[in-house]
Amino acid sequence: MPEAQTGGVVVRMRACGICGSDLEKVYGMYSKPSMRLGHEPAGTVESVGGDAGGLRAGDRVFTHHHVSCGSCRHCARGEETLCATYSSTNLSPCGLAEHYAVPALNVARGGVLPLPDHVTFEQAAMVEPLACCLRAWDALECGEGDTVAVLGCGPTGIMHSMIARSRGIAAVCTDTNDYRVDFARELGATEAVRPERGADCVRGATGGRGADAVIVATGSARAIADGVGMAREGGTVMLFGVPPRGSTVELDAGDLYARGVGVRSSYAASDADTRRALGMIAGGRIDVARLITHRYRLAEAGEAFERARGGESAMKVVITE
């Protein structure tokens, strides 16, 4: 078992979600530097290294794997996830372990959040992906009565749809997986269809105008190109899914220019984002538990990854211990 450094803690993992980026690390060509698995863990504090911000053994917590320095140019501009410290901090050995150490810096910078009594470990394992979604929404100028297109009906894609619904925004969702299309529809998407019907649905939902924002919640280059075509004049395309390393997209730059379509991306989440996400879950504003379809023990992690990889009949897969 790892030891708690001074100011840090060791946590016994009780639940950890499998993310699409975990699958990309195992099976694909991940485009970010860290190759550690499991960045959505929650658990119980096992040991504390001296003064650790008031944390005590036995506390139920969510733990964020990355934290920013809070003082660099990126942090000053609200770009915490681009901070050099952010990518250098992590859990050890990783979140997908019986026990993992949380560095003192993570504790000091708000990377460990005590859980309200009524929030389960499984719900807490959904804090990080929801936080990532909320951060992406902060960069979108969408309000009540608008329409977003969500390309990709995986767990975060459906979270985007749920956020839209909570704000009075229509969500047209697409996916190549019929199971996930049906899942999105059941969880409140305004429309959920296969990609070949996506553009027509968006036009129908907006009177031909196009989506105010398109969230590409998949790493598919084809989906990115499709998304640009679905955006209205002056709309925004948000790259949210992780494209494999070396991905290229062919776009008509003249069309982007003439229609004033913006393309941007959103990576990960800050400590402030995780606090907001936990607050939404605790307040019942986003029912993340409905996304969990499969649970596996840590010893069954290989089977869990295969289930999550297939996706034909699975949404969120969570490792419990």
Model-identified regions with their sequence ranges:
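Glycine-rich beta-strand-centered segment in the early N-terminal region that forms part
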Residues: 2-16, 29-73, 81, 113-116
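Conserved beta-strand positions in the Rossmann-like core of class I SAM-dependent methyltransferases
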Residues: 46, 172, 238
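NAD(P)H dinucleotide-binding glycine-rich loop of Rossmann-like/cofactor-binding domains
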Residues: 69-151
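Adenosine-nucleotide cofactor-binding segment
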Residues: 147-150, 163-226
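N-terminal Rossmann-fold NAD(P) dinucleotide-binding loop
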Residues: 157-158
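C-terminal hydrophobic helical "lid"/dimerization subdomain
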Residues: 225-229, 271-321
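Helix-to-beta-strand junctions that scaffold the AdoMet/dcAdoMet cofactor pocket
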Residues: 231-233
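Rossmann-fold NAD(P)-binding glycine/threonine-rich loop
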Residues: 242-260
